[in-house]
């Protein structure tokens, strides 16, 4: 797998289109940190460590719906393995005039765009969520 974060975002997007309540994805620290941001911003119910059918470590993500519709309307990968996107604190874009969230990997950890601005740090923009 060349893009683990992109794979996880695609699994979430596909599962929500099918109306699934949970989705499994292979475990990694970076994926867990991204899920922490999604949970703190209210886009997923939560996640927990699990094992897949072959015994490999995995993360089971509990998806969130509001009145039968997915809470996440748009989930886009920004920085990709073939084209990394780094931005300074003043260049981090607001998503949909502040209604959405950019997830940024900074030297101080993975955080939302608002937290990155508050901490005055830039970094790699992993994805945007609306």
Swiss-Prot record:
Coiled-coil blocks: none
Keywords: Ribonucleoprotein, Ribosomal protein, RNA-binding, rRNA-binding
One annotated Gene Ontology cellular component of this protein: ribosome
One Gene Ontology molecular-function label: structural constituent of ribosome
Gene3D superfamilies: 3.30.1370.30, 3.30.1490.10
Domain of life: Bacteria
Signal peptide segment: none
Biological process terms in GO annotation: translation
HAMAP family in the record: Ribosomal_uS8_B
Similarity-based family: Belongs to the universal ribosomal protein uS8 family.
Function recorded in the entry: One of the primary rRNA binding proteins, it binds directly to 16S rRNA central domain where it helps coordinate assembly of the platform of the 30S subunit.
Assembly: Part of the 30S ribosomal subunit. Contacts proteins S5 and S12.
PANTHER family assigned to the protein according to its UniProt record, in alphabetical order: 40S RIBOSOMAL PROTEIN S15A
The protein, known as: Small ribosomal subunit protein uS8
Organism: Ruegeria sp. (strain TM1040)
Name of the gene this protein is made from: rpsH
């Amino acid at each position: 797998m060349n893009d683990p974060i992109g794979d996880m975002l695609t699994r979430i997007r596909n599962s929500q289109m099918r109306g699934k309540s949970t989705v499994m994805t292979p475990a990694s620290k970076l994926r867990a940190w991204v899920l922490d941001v999604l949970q703190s911003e209210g886009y997923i119910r939560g996640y927990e460590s699990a094992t897949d059918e072959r015994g490999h470590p995995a993360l089971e993500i509990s998806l969130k719906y509001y009145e039968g519709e997915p809470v996440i309307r748009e989930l886009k990968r920004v920085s990709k393995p073939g084209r990394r996107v780094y931005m300074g604190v003043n260049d981090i874009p607001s998503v949909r005039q502040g209604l959405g969230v950019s997830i940024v990997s900074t030297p101080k950890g993975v955080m939302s765009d608002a937290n990155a601005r508050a901490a005055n740090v830039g970094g790699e923009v992993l994805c945007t969520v609306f």
